[in-house]
Regions:
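Amphipathic alpha-helical scaffolding segments comprising HEAT/armadillo-like alpha-solenoid repeats
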Residues: 2-16, 35-48, 69-82, 101-115, ...
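General structural signal for alpha-helix termini and helix-helix connectors
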Residues: 50, 116, 131-134, 150, ...
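Preference for long, well-ordered alpha-helical segments
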Residues: 142-151, 159-165
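Short N-terminal amphipathic alpha-helix/helix-capping patch enriched in small hydrophobics
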Residues: 9, 24-25, 40, 56
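Structural detector for internal amphipathic alpha-helices that build alpha-solenoid repeat scaffolds
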Residues: 1-4, 23-35, 46, 57-69, ...
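Acidic/histidine-rich alpha-helical segments that form the ligand environment
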Residues: 113, 118, 125
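Short inter-helical turns and helix N-cap capping residues of alpha-solenoid HEAT/ARM repeat scaffolds
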Residues: 20-21, 52-53, 84-85, 117-118, ...
Length: 178
């Protein structure tokens, strides 16, 4: 398939994802399985966040949990930063972990989400960071450790403090790699 016809198909899928007709949306979601376009990640997350249809949510979650396209990490991180996705941020973090993405350059962002987010979001961030196999830049780890220490000391009674302490321990153990 030529690049222009592939782009046209992706644009058609995007249009159908937001058609408002559940049957058309489901067909568009199913078409996404045959595409390896990173430009579909954010629209799929938007559909996931906005649909009331459990079947559509399940299909989208399955796609995003198993996504293997170049630059998916950037699309997920952009979606995490989008305030419109606040109610599904835990799910986006889960998609990152399930898809095997190694966000080594974004450890600080994940640490800040763990601190500022819900308990469930903090747990997802811990899981992602614990399972990173790739080398993480030392300065990112040191910055995350500093931010976590500050958060833990300033919020000792926060229900997430134990979880944040676990994250701190994971990050500190990674400093031994240097």
């Amino acid at each position: 398939m030529s690049s222009s016809s592939k782009n046209k198909l992706v644009e058609e899928i995007k249009k159908d994802l937001f058609s408002g007709d559940d049957v058309v949306v489901m067909k568009a979601v199913l078409k996404c399985k045959d595409q390896d376009s990173v430009t579909l990640v954010e629209p799929l997350i938007a559909v996931y966040a906005s649909t009331g249809m459990p079947e559509i949510r399940r299909e989208v979650a399955d796609l995003l949990n198993n996504i293997k396209v170049p630059n998916a990490e950037q699309a997920f991180l952009k979606a995490l930063a989008n305030k419109q996705n606040a109610k599904v941020r835990k799910d986006i973090l889960s998609f990152i972990w399930n898809s095997g993405i190694q966000p080594t350059e974004h450890i600080v962002d994940l640490t800040e989400i763990a601190i500022d987010g819900s308990f469930e979001e903090a747990l997802e961030c811990l899981t992602i960071i614990e399972n990173i196999d790739d080398q993480v830049p030392e300065e990112k780890i040191l910055e995350s450790v500093s931010v976590l220490r500050s958060a833990i000391s300033s919020q000792p009674n926060d229900p997430k403090t134990g979880l944040l302490a676990d994250l701190l321990s994971v990050l500190e153990s990674r400093t031994e790699e240097f």
